[in-house]
Each structure stands twice: as structure tokens, then as C-alpha cells.
């Protein structure tokens, strides 16, 4: 038991190595962050590595680490000097703590920040950490400027930092495109064990991933085997067509092996730069049956008001309702004031093609109910039927009888038997409202209006072919 406790303590130390002095040619700029609005009350240290090659004028590439950084500095120095990787500014972020007046920690925020499955930490980096970094200057007066292109940005972490690195890029591929995760906590801490399934079901992101773990990695067996879950994540990434490599080392929950291969990992992560990592082609038959090759989401409107709703109208257009104002929106992005009598559908009720079923969303639930429509117009035999990964928002059917659900994780698409087959992701992540116009799907995400051409249509032409119970 004593050995087990010592092993746990040592593994945590490796996971959150402090930033200490090491041999390097660049400069370290340090500051404290105590004013976070996303993680209120937390205090943390930020260390910024600025290589001597950085000129203070051209925005540099970015390397973010949630797991220390002193061991990386000589590696970054050498690879940058040799031209094997671009000029990179390193930002090393410690986990937050809340301290009392005497300086004693009363809350450790590490797991809450790093193990979560939402986009909160990505938002923290985007809106709080990086703006604070860019307000600093080096000792010789160079301003710190960081590229905002995803292809120029990489992120690393060990243990909880490992799953955080992956989650940040997964949630916001517009921010980061290159990921190094070691001993990643893809276990049942805060939902990370869902990733092997989600990776398979979601449309691939344009990110490149290097996975490292050790064959005896099981920090606490209560939560599962770290190594086994990392193997499942690797399998899922390969299935979904990602640019992925891995290295399985000997040992337990430690960053030692990850640090040893850091130079080779960095070379591979930035191979082909500045080209963006390629978006993979998934082996999912559902994804193949839905997506038009080369077609992506197009932003056709901004500053969409909170509470705005989309409604189907015809093959050519949808209705965008913002309060009392109604507009027709077309796939080319044009918008005109809606005229005449406009009948708006209930966004939380959907009629199955052919009229045999009715689906109803229940607020605050990750289930959608299904009812059978009787000849006299009543709903019967209601059941919780469609199981979701996040609470349901607006719902609608396509012509094949698949249910589309707007949610915080994107647009969840369920088959006729109530199972999520795929999740369509938008740049903003959360989707609040959706509507079909023919084979164009419209969606609102983070105040922006998007449209995408699909191989599926929202036009119902009778009862679709049954998938039976398979």
C-alpha cells in the first residue's frame, strides 16, 4: 500500500512539473494570473518562452503546455536554431488554485479545468491567457505576437493535461491543429472515457495527433486503465482517418518516456508546415452517406441574436425568426424580409416522414421521446427513445427518417432506432437551432449563421425505407 501511495504522488509530480531553470538560449517571461472570469478566484503562474530567433514583429507559432516546460526549452532552442521547426513561442500554464488570506489552498482546480469535456479551457486560453501573454514584452522590448492560425499552433499535456490538450484541439480546431498527449486521462474522471466512441461518430477535424503512453499506466484502477483507453483512442482516430502516430513505452504513469521522444514528436507535428493538417476520411458509412466531399460549413451571417430560431419553409429557403422579425434565408446567404402568412413549426416537435411517428424534446434531458400517431390524431405509446450525448435542443427529421438534434456538442444525428450515428461539428461547437431547405442544412452557432450542402434532404416524400431493428 505504501508503495502504491508513493507511486501516485510521484506520478502527480511528473504530471505537473514546476517551471524551473534549465539550459536554454531564449528568454522566460513570467507573470501571475489572478483575475480569471472563466475560473473565478483562481491563482496561477504563466511562463512564456521566447526564442532568440523571434524578431518581435512577425507573429510566431505557438506551443501551449499544461504540464510544465523546463525540460522542453533546450529542445525548442535546438530545433528552432536548426530550422527543423518554425519559430515558436511557448506558453506554460499551471493549474489554478483558490487560496485563503493566509495563502493556503482551499480548492485545487486542476481536474476541473483539465479533465472536462467541454470547450471551457479552450475559451480560457483564447480569451484570457493568450491576450494576457500578448501584453508582455521581453527584456529587450520585443512585443510578444502570436499567430492566430490553427496551423501555427500546437498543444501538449501529460496525464490530465494530456486529455486537455486533445480536448482543446477537438473542441476548437480553429485554434489548435497539432496535439501531443502523453498518459492522457481518457478515463472516467469527467467523461473522457466517451472519447473512443465520439471520435468514431464525429466528423473528423483537421488536427494531427501524437499519442504516448506506457504499458503499465493505471494511475488509479478505480477509474480504469489509462493505457487501455489510450489504445482505444488510437483505434478510434485511425478509424476516423486522422493523421495520428503513437509510442507505447515501458512503465507506469510518468512523463519520462514522453520527454525522451519530444524532439521527434515536434518534428513530426510540424512536418509539412505551414500547410494545415489534412482532414481525415472516416470509415463511417453514415458519414459517407451524409457529407458531400469538399463541402464545408459556410458562414453566411453574423451577429445573430440570442434566442433566434430557424424554421423550414421550402426547398429553397428557411425562415430566421428573431423576436417578431422574420426573414427568408437562402443557401447563397441572401436574406429578404418574410412576407405573407408564415406558419412556423414547433422547433421541439418533429413529425416523422410519412406521419407515423412524432418526436418530442424534453427540456434539460438527453433523451428525445418518440410517440406513435394514431388514426384519430392522438399520440400513443410514448417512450424515451433517442439517446443523446448532450441535452436536446431543436429537432427535425430528414427524408430518411434520421433525427437531427441541435446540442452543445454539435448536431447529433440519430438513426431510426434511436442511436446517435454521427455528430456534425461546427466551428463554434454548440448549435442552438437548425433547419433544412432541400439538401441544405442551416444552423446557428455562437451567433453565426451557417449552411452546408448534404447528401441528405429535409424534404419528406412519404415513409422512408425501414432499417428494421438492426
Map each language-model feature to its residues:
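Residues that line or immediately flank small-molecule/substrate-binding pockets and catalytic motifs
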Residues: 8, 67, 157, 183, ...
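Non-catalytic cap/lid and distal C-terminal segments of serine-dependent acyl enzymes
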Residues: 23-281
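Sequence-structural signature of mature extracellular/luminal beta-sheet repeat domains
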Residues: 278-470
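Sec/Tat signal peptide C-region and signal peptidase I cleavage site
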Residues: 17-23
